[in-house]
Amino acid sequence: MDTSDFNFVFLGQSVLKYQVPLDVYNTINHIYETKYPELKPANKQLVGKIEKEHSLFFNGEDSNKMTKHNYLPDNVLGWFEQKFKHYLEWNKIREYNLHFNSVWINTMFENEYNPVHVHQGTLFTGLSSVMILKLPESY
């Protein structure tokens, strides 16, 4: 596997930084911008103090907060899965059950934030990722 597209920092638990392919980046932005009116608000299931949180993918248990749905094409989901598997291999985690649960977009404005929180899952560490899609010109 080619590993030239990432870097790492040890902070107790490893943090890996990947370069997102332009087609994945453009696809996610395009879906968000064109499907925005259809996207389910994700606020009920997220801890962020953010007004605009919308789900692009959910594969968890259906509840009153969220039901299964998918707006992402296979190449985008496959890219995430490939990176999560690489993360596990990098950390020498050999036995795991990978369950890709959710993808959402936070559109954040001044004074909005994500508090410190824990993501739960069956893997002892859980996996989480963040992708910055757009920054204001004044940033």
Which residue ranges define each predicted feature?
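Non-heme Fe(II)/2-oxoglutarate
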Residues: 1-95, 111-114
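Hydrophobic residues on conserved beta-strands that form the core of alpha/beta folds
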Residues: 100-102
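Catalytic core of non-heme Fe(II) oxygenases with the double-stranded beta-helix
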Residues: 104-139
